């Protein structure tokens, strides 16, 4: 386990949980004093943020545990489960916003004190921007799916807070239905983000192959290595921070076993240099036993 990976992923999860807790308290106060349905939408979203971030925090801590006898490939899939759980939380909040928005659209109510709502929303907007910037940096360093899902969630919050500012300003100037209309628009965007997040999580749980650019890098490293005649049957997937890479190397028929072993280890080390922490499994094939149609055939 890379200690840097564990430290930054935990820091990002803790930061999100702390911010969600603070914003929830502030937004309850603001909604109570304004009656804004857009602020109610923000309040519900912060409640969902807190539940999702707490789930994320516990799951991330679990996923960082090393492999054991019962989980020989580690616990990385827990990150995908966290992302899937977040998508469910977010979908539920979007449906609630639709119901509330339609009700206030049919019967708009004047806001009591929009200035409080505007001030609170500005605080939420800038603090969430800081969190998203930190999360994006962590994702670039770790490629954590759980933190990436959380980041996408809070990115939608940034847009939502911007929309709420506009809605509150319009309501202040007499556009009474603007509040409800923006709440509905926010609900649509949140639902879209949730569905996209859920799709990515399911694809990871189904062991989707690594991205095309990473697969091409693997192919380039293997085929350019001296002594390798060819390769085939590349299999890749990702679980948490760990990439899994499996392939067959094609070698000269009469190459001594020890030489073949050393060559395979050299290729493995080259792949590990490019993809630190990867789990690489290489099978050596004499080139004469590989059918012509399988030679250099990377797909299964």
Curated annotation (Swiss-Prot):
It catalyses: Zn(2+)(in) + H(+)(out) = Zn(2+)(out) + H(+)(in); Cd(2+)(in) + H(+)(out) = Cd(2+)(out) + H(+)(in); Fe(2+)(in) + H(+)(out) = Fe(2+)(out) + H(+)(in). InterPro entries: Cation_efflux (IPR002524), Cation_efflux_CTD (IPR027470), Cation_efflux_CTD_sf (IPR036837), Cation_efflux_FieF (IPR023783), Cation_efflux_TMD_sf (IPR027469), CDF_Transporter (IPR050291). The keyword Oxidoreductase does not apply. One of its GO terms (biological process) is intracellular zinc ion homeostasis. SUPFAM superfamilies: Cation efflux protein cytoplasmic domain-like (SSF160240), Cation efflux protein transmembrane domain-like (SSF161111). GO terms for molecular function: cadmium ion transmembrane transporter activity; ferrous iron transmembrane transporter activity; metal ion binding; zinc efflux antiporter activity. Gene3D superfamilies: Cation efflux protein transmembrane domain, Cation efflux protein, cytoplasmic domain. The keyword Ion transport applies. Zn(2+) binds at residues 45, 49, 153, 157. It is found in: Cell inner membrane. Its main location: membrane. Belongs to the cation diffusion facilitator (CDF) transporter (TC 2.A.4) family. FieF subfamily. Divalent metal cation transporter which exports Zn(2+), Cd(2+) and possibly Fe(2+). May be involved in zinc and iron detoxification by efflux. Homodimer. This is Cation-efflux pump FieF. The lineage of its organism: Bacteria, Pseudomonadati, Pseudomonadota, Gammaproteobacteria, Enterobacterales. The gene is fieF.
């Amino acid at each position: 386990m890379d200690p840097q990976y564990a430290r930054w992923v935990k820091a990002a999860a803790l930061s999100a949980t702390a911010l969600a807790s603070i914003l929830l308290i502030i937004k309850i106060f603001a909604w109570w004093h304004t009656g804004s349905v857009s602020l109610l939408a923000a309040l519900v979203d912060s409640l969902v943020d807190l539940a999702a971030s707490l789930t994320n925090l516990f799951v991330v801590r679990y996923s960082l545990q090393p492999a054991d006898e019962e989980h020989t490939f580690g616990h990385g899939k827990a990150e995908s489960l966290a992302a899937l759980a977040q998508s469910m939380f977010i979908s539920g909040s979007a449906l609630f916003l639709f119901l509330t928005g339609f009700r206030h659209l049919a019967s708009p109510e004047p806001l009591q004190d929009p200035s409080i709502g505007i001030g609170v929303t500005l605080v939420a907007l800038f603090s969430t921007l800081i969190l998203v910037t930190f999360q994006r940096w962590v994702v670039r360093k770790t490629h954590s799916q759980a933190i990436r899902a959380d980041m996408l969630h809070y990115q939608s919050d940034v847009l939502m807070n911007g929309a709420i500012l506009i809605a509150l300003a319009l309501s202040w100037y007499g556009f009474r239905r603007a509040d409800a209309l923006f709440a509905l628009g926010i609900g649509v965007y949140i639902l879209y983000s949730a569905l996209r997040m859920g799709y990515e999580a399911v694809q990871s749980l189904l062991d989707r192959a690594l991205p095309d650019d990473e697969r091409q890098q693997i192919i380039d490293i293997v085929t350019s290595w001296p002594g390798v005649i060819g390769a085939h049957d590349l299999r890749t997937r990702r679980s948490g921070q760990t990439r899994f890479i499996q392939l067959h190397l094609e070698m000269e028929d009469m190459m001594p076993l020890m030489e073949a072993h050393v060559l395979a280890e050299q290729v493995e080390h080259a792949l590990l240099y490019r993809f630190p922490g990867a789990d690489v499994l290489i099978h050596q094939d004499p080139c004469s036993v590989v059918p012509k149609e399988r030679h250099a055939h990377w797909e299964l």
